[in-house]
Design a protein with these regions (language model features):
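C-terminal binding/interaction regions
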Residues: 175
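Feature captures the catalytic cores and cofactor-binding loops of soluble hydro-lyases/lyases
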Residues: 2-171, 184-239
Length: 239
């Protein structure tokens, strides 16, 4: 018996399996880790540009595995498809080419995402129904807002490597977002990244305690001066 090949997708359309996803325990461990700390631990070279939170409550954070979508600017057909494929805890990350002329997601899609128990949405493009997004519950990061709606014609691809507001995002990457922006990390880097992040958080906690103490004890401020001067001397400065 001859096997029947699966029907081919038209050019520009594709839906792929996501493949590797982060260990749920690792995802949970990253909740509450600031994006600034993760960015520093990744060499200060990764992070979104031009995205801002639109979910109202700046204390609301995003943490989950990426389900990536690439769309034609101004078209959201494949985002609708992605919503039907998403699992609880996923983050839909959309490469909309940074176009802000037409909204790619609105209030109805927000409700669909909430029903799917998504961890959040990141859109390199516009959203609309801003008041509804600002109610919170679902973290959303986007490049802008537009009242003009999208088309639903395609093409588009799901679970492919994408570029999103300066980020290189692959399906299954860990996505973190907070008031400072969005960062991503590949699943295989998470164990060592988590260790580094915890060490940095411990260092910062120590520094915070020192600064608080120095408000009441001026003698402690000399430590800060010496630390800065040591950095300058290492660069040849005569201090």
């Amino acid at each position: 018996m001859t096997a029947t090949a699966a029907p081919a997708w038209p050019p520009g359309f594709a839906v792929h399996d996501r493949g590797i996803v982060p260990d749920p325990k690792l995802v949970a461990a990253f909740r509450g880790v600031p994006t600034a700390v993760v960015s520093d631990c990744l060499g200060r070279t990764v992070g979104s540009r031009g995205l801002r939170p639109y979910h109202g409550d700046l204390a609301l954070t995003l943490c989950g595995a990426a389900l990536t979508v690439r769309v034609r600017p101004g078209d959201n057909l494949m985002i609708h498809k992605a919503l039907t494929l998403a699992r609880a805890g996923d983050v839909i990350v959309v490469d909309g080419s940074g176009d802000v002329s037409h909204a790619l997601m609105g209030g109805l899609m927000r409700l669909a995402a909430l029903a799917r128990e998504l961890a959040g949405v990141v859109v390199d493009g516009s959203i609309r129904d801003s008041v509804e997004w600002a109610e919170g519950e679902l973290p959303v990061f986007a490049r802008g807002v537009s009242h003009r709606g999208p088309t639903k014609d395609g093409p588009g691809e799901i679970n492919v490597p994408i570029a999103c507001a300066g980020l290189s995002v692959s399906p299954g990457d860990l996505v973190l977002g907070d008031a400072d922006g969005v960062v991503v990390a590949a699943p295989d880097r998470l164990p060592t990244l988590l260790e580094a992040a915890r060490e940095k958080l411990a260092e910062e906690a120590e520094q915070q305690a020192h600064h608080l103490a120095s408000q009441h004890d001026p003698s402690l401020r000399g430590r800060d001066m010496e630390r800065v001067d040591a950095l300058l001397r290492a660069r040849g400065c005569p201090v």
